[in-house]
Amino acid sequence: MNGIINVLKPAGMTSFDVVSHLRRVAGQKKIGHTGTLDPSAVGVLPICLGSATRAIEFIIDKDKVYRAELTLGSATDTQDSSGNVIFSGRVDADENRIAEVIMSFVGETDQLPPMYSAIKIDGKKLYQLARQGETVERQPRKITIYDIRILRIWEATERLPGNVAGSVPQPEVQVKKALFEVHCSKGTYIRTLCHDIGEKIGCGGHMSFLIRTRAGRYDLDSALTLEEIKKLALNKELESRLISAETVFDDFESIHLSEKEAFKYNNGVWLKINYQKDDTNPFIRVYDYNNIFLGIGEIFNNGQDTCLKSKKFFIKD
């Protein structure tokens, strides 16, 4: 099978767990996910099968939309509600101040990746080091928050995350919460955004809920639950529900090749072409003379001519 399944990831599963599950259900060896979604989070997780796995890097590069709940009054070691409290403070900020601080994160900024993340340093994932009690130096990464839409801010009484000595539940405390929608670039950690908001207010904060509502062009409306996917597979209907990898590149310009050009292109030959390309994106959808999608090409100048070379082939496996 070749194509994309837009999965509605449930809470409690890692992105790799979802891939392993679908590998068994679909009987598919060549399969991969398009970017880690926290185990506690739910939402859109496009999974690529067969030749569509060549589109993974392009989907990862797309912007994302999340809906998150921020709890103010405590910070945790994981920056979400699964961790233990490392700082707690009284929330004196009113609704206007909270909203002001949240909105101050809109724009391009440097974000320090959390220790509890899948980023690798010297071959080891950060979360593996964190579980061993280690903290290592990380470099901030450029991210962009395109927009934040605050949906609600309210007060609540709840127990702090984690346990105190002897596994005794934490006491109940007064907290403030904010529910907001954020549109951001790839590589943005919403947990870290919540942590940083709490730090800027001065009371500590952590992410208490997260749902990814969109990854690139794939949204909740087209997402399938694992139960739905299993039923489709049992009924031999899953392949008919796969989304073409071509859809990943809907916003790319396109070019059609003659029979002679297509033959050369498919054999890795650079083609001299007469084409005025958008400088902001060197990549282009390539079709043959029968309007069959061949893959993604790259437009470049060799010093004399405008040329086309293959970047990714999407001829079905």
Question: What is the role of each PLM region?
Answer:
Residues 58-113:
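Acidic, low-complexity central loop/insert segments
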